[in-house]
Amino acid sequence: MAFPVLNLLLDVAVSSEAATNSAIGMIGSFLAAAAFIVVPAASFLIWVSQKDALERKR
């Protein structure tokens, strides 16, 4: 038994329902992060960039 930790990980019986719920939760977390962090930050940066471009043309 060279890798006891590996054997512990392989011997754990995880139901497919638990794995599916975990995957759905992870995807939900990614979508929430995109909605609350990435989209507003990108929108703000685009707005600042466009505002700066308009001010340079004057």
Curated annotation (Swiss-Prot):
The keyword Isomerase does not apply. The chain crosses the membrane at residues 27-47. The keyword Ubl conjugation does not apply. One of its GO terms (cellular component) is photosystem II. It is a single-pass membrane protein. Belongs to the PsbX family. Type 2 subfamily. PSII consists of a core antenna complex that captures photons, and an electron transfer chain that converts photonic excitation into a charge separation. PSII forms dimeric complexes. This is Photosystem II reaction center X protein. It comes from Prochlorococcus marinus (strain MIT 9211).
